[in-house]
């Protein structure tokens, strides 16, 4: 009987974890969409177009790395 219970757990465990993984993957596009909507609402020097060296060069945002450039975002 105990072997049957262990076998059932071993069979059902991957199914439960696979469903959990699908839920996490389904939520990622929403996060990306929200990030895109948020970045589109940025105006002024915080839109990623103004060059900067330190955070003091940006008003209301941070100086961030974009590839080999630093921009206010």
From Swiss-Prot:
Tissue: Expressed by the venom duct.
GO cellular component, one term: extracellular region
Bridged cysteine pairs (disulfide): 46-61, 52-63, 58-72
Residues spanning the signal sequence: 1-18
Intracellular or extracellular location(s): Secreted
Keyword Transmembrane attached: no
GO MF entry, a single one: toxin activity
Keyword set, alphabetical order: Cleavage on pair of basic residues, Disulfide bond, Neurotoxin, Secreted, Signal, Toxin
Proregion residues excised on maturation: 19-41
Keyword Hydrolase: no
Domain text: The cysteine framework is IX (C-C-C-C-C-C).
Protein name stated in the entry: Conotoxin Cl9.2
Native species: Californiconus californicus
